[in-house]
Amino acid sequence: LLAGPALEGGRPTLKLDLAPEAAPAQMLGRYKLLEKIGEGGFGEVWMAEQREPVKRRVALKIIKLGMDSRQVVARFEAERQALAMMDHANIARIFDAGTTDTGRPYFVMELVQGVPLTQYCDQHRLTLQERLELFVPVCQAVQHAHQKGIIHRDIKPSNVLVTLLDGVPVPKVIDFGVAKAVGQRLTDNT
């Protein structure tokens, strides 16, 4: 399924034709795919292990096989560019991006291992005050995106994951898949 890594325009590329039920432990450049952790209409998100220059767990998002129309690719590229423009503690960070040798773009981002906002609040029986305090950083993250000219357009509990950092709950906004740029274009195709 996979060919050895190559470079195209300075970015790693290789052949990757994963079926949704493909076995894990395949390589995509310096990333070892471990487990599919999410799937949307056009893309799949895999937990992966970055092998170099540092070892760490990451999330790798790639367009589904057969869904690589111009419109879908443009939307995908807009999402990764939107993420690249933002630097906020409550927005999942992008680390890397590339294209397989079959033209399927992917990007690598911070792995947020958490649960949806409402699930966290319900499981921990948070009071209204505690829920509001947990939601303030979400509002700050959305404001940061707006200051960068990015509108998320899909804020919902499943796109705000709560993870623990040193025992403290930290909400993270994820999935800028339908984000829109205001007053600018994210890519030449959007």
Stretch-by-stretch model annotation:
Residues 1-11:
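Negatively charged linear elements and acidic catalytic determinants
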Residues 14-190:
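Conserved ATP-binding/catalytic core of the eukaryotic-like protein kinase fold
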